[in-house]
C-alpha cells in the first residue's frame, strides 16, 4: 500500500509500520529517512514528531509517556488483517521488548500491568518469544 500510494493512514504509519520497526530496534534515523523517502506528506513538521516522538519513542518521552507499541491483538482489532504466522512473530517481538525494558514499564502506571502479564506466561512461551525475537533482530 505504501509503495503504491506513497501514503499510510496515521494508525498504519504509527501502530503498524512504526511499531514493527521499533520492535525490530531499527535505528530511528534510518526509520526517519525511510519515512521521508516513501511518504507523500513527508515534511519535517509531520515526520519528526511521527518518527522520533511517537513511533520510535526516541525523544526521551517528551511527546508521549510510553512507546506506541502493541501485540498482534491490537493490529487484528484495528485492521482487516487475518490471524496468521505473523501474529506469533509480532507477539514475540512485543513481549521480548516488554521483558527487556521491565524497569521502564514497571515504573509507568499505564504499562506496569504488562510486566505482570509477561511474568504469568509459561517458561516455554517466553523461551520461544526470545528465540523468535533474536532471530529477527539485526
Name these PLM-found stretches.
Residues 1-138:
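C-terminal catalytic domain of photolyase/cryptochrome flavoproteins
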Amino acid at each position: 500500500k505504501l509503495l503504491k500510494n506513497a501514503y499510510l493512514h496515521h494508525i498504519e504509519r504509527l501502530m503498524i509500520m512504526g511499531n514493527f520497526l521499533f520492535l525490530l530496534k531499527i535505528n530511528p534515523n534510518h526509520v526517519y529517512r525511510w519515512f521521508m523517502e516513501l511518504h507523500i506528506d513527508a515534511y519535517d513538521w509531520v515526520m519528526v514528531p511521527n518518527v522520533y516522538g511517537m513511533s520510535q519513542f526516541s525523544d526521551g518521552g517528551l511527546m508521549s509517556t510510553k512507546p506506541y507499541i502493541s501485540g498482534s491483538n491490537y493490529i487484528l482489532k484495528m485492521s482487516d488483517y487475518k490471524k496468521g504466522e505473523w501474529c506469533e512473530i509480532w507477539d514475540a517481538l512485543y513481549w521480548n521488548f516488554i521483558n527487556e525494558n521491565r524497569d521502564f514499564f514497571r515504573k509507568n502506571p499505564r504499562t506496569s500491568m504488562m510486566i505482570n502479564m509477561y511474568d504469568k506466561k509459561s517458561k516455554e512461551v517466553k523461551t520461544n518469544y526470545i528465540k523468535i525475537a533474536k532471530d529477527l533482530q539485526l
